[in-house]
Amino acid sequence: KGIDTDSFIAVTDTKYEGFVPGEIKTAAVPADMVEGINIMDNSTVTLVLYDKDVNGNHKDFAHVVGDFNNWTLSNDEKSQMYRDDASGCWWITLAGLDAGKEYAFQYYVGTKEGEVIHLADAYTEKILDPDNDKDISASTYNENLVYPKGGVGIVSTFKIQKDSYNWKYNDFKIANPEQLVIYELHLRDFTATSDINGAMGKLSYLKEMGVNAIELMPVQEFDGNDSWGYNPC
């Protein structure tokens, strides 16, 4: 009986072809920029990422991906960052942004050997956390963005036109600061309702104990929703 010879067909998958970073583009960081998120005007933001170890080494490439470029890596002005060896930073200026929109983004940095890291901006004021955000109830905070499909781990955010807050008392001053009796208060664990309204209902209790000042703990993002915020992030 006969046996047919094997035949092979070469297929190229262009849709899922691996991204190849371009050659490093060098340029000085624009004047007056600081590390992190720099708001330039109502439609422009400059991102600056420090990357230099104790030996002066740095990664071979750095890109940014986010809502502003549909989480797409590319070797153009929408994704590839410039390198400035004098400052030890990568940077990119993003234009054509919506001042009232909150954007999620990450840095994509790595080496020619294949090491890749997805980073949130260390100076962001708000993060998206795929592991812990689901445990934050709407009654606690209902303005979180939906975690992006293109994100990996912690994702940073920015908004050009930040929401303003109108203070009810603009002339408040602490009388006799040397006489303060400060109570460190964590809203979640202080009352059964775990919110500021519950704490306000207990002000008379604190006053009876001689407390005349409250320090809310904490007021910033911290690691782990069940923590009190003392552990470092």
Residue ranges with predicted function:
Residues 1, 101-105:
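Exposed beta-strand face motif in extracellular beta-rich ectodomains
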Residues 2-58, 142-148, 172:
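Non-catalytic, glycine-rich low-complexity segments
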Residues 47-102, 110-134:
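Aromatic-rich carbohydrate-binding modules that target alpha-glucans
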Residues 105, 109, 114-169:
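Core domains of carbohydrate- and sulfate-ester-processing enzymes
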Residues 166-186:
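Aromatic-rich, solvent-exposed beta-strand/loop patch
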Residues 186-214:
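A conserved hydrophobic secondary-structure block that centers on an alpha-helix together
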Residues 206-233:
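Aromatic-lined carbohydrate-binding/catalytic grooves of carbohydrate-active enzymes
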